[in-house]
Swiss-Prot record:
This is Procathepsin L. Pfam families: Peptidase_C1. Dimer of a heavy and a light chain linked by disulfide bonds. Zn(2+) 7 binds at residue 164. Zn(2+) 6 binds at residue 162.
Length: 218
């Protein structure tokens, strides 16, 4: 795998979004991975609907604004035969509506998902290099994460098991001798480094970045 990769430069990544006061990070991680794979196969970058996932993937085990898993959302897209565009099914940051999916606005699909071997940063690196942006879950429960602004994030108290936030790895690189993952968050562009965080890479699966990583098959 190359020493550095940044899928933003290749057109795979939509602008940073904002989940608001709703525990729907899992939906944003899911759409991010699907947007990348749709671009890889179709050559078009289309923003996909998180609200579609929030409202409609309860049968797969997701809980709207109270949390969910990216794999269950990938499963929903497969079960449902697609996901609507952001434009046709806009985000409300609420989960009190019934499913409003409409097949005519279907903008992407998947045929399942691949889980990266648990805790293997090298396998994650290979996947990011060959496939594109990958969904990951991390421990984001520290104030150092909430208030991150720049630099390579390393939190001594970070857990590799207690994961509470779904995000998207869009690449990796190094600065001096320090390696990092390029991570797209869903807290708006004002958070972090223009909405992104650069997280320590190859430091014993820091914050669990490779503990629950996956991507959709398209």
């Amino acid at each position: 795998a190359p020493r550095s990769v940044d899928w933003r430069e290749k057109g795979y990544v939509t602008p940073v979004k904002d989940q608001g006061q709703c525990g729907s990070c899992w939906a944003f991680s899911t759409t991010g991975a699907l947007e990348g794979q749709h671009f890889r196969t179709k050559g078009k970058l289309v923003s996909l609907s998180e609200q579609n996932l929030v409202d409609c993937s309860r049968p797969e085990g997701n809980q709207g604004c109270n949390g969910g898993l990216m794999d269950q959302a990938f499963q929903y897209v497969q079960d449902n035969g697609g996901i609507d565009s952001e434009e046709s099914y806009p985000y409300t940051a609420k989960d009190d509506e019934d499913c409003r999916y409409k097949a005519e606005y279907n903008a992407a699909n998947d045929t399942g998902f691949v889980d990266i071997p648990q805790g293997h940063e090298r396998a994650l690196m290979k996947a990011v290099a060959s496939v594109g942006p990958v969904s990951v879950a991390i421990d984001a429960g520290h104030s150092s994460f909430q208030f991150y602004q720049s630099g390579i994030y390393y939190e001594p108290d970070c857990s590799s098991e207690d994961l509470d936030h779904g995000v998207l790895v869009v690449g990796y690189g190094f600065e001096g001798g320090k390696k990092y993952w390029i991570v797209k968050n869903s807290w708006g562009e004002k958070w972090g480094d223009k909405g992104y965080i650069y997280m320590a890479k190859d430091r014993k699966n820091h914050c669990g970045i490779a503990t629950a990583a996956s991507y959709p098959l398209v």
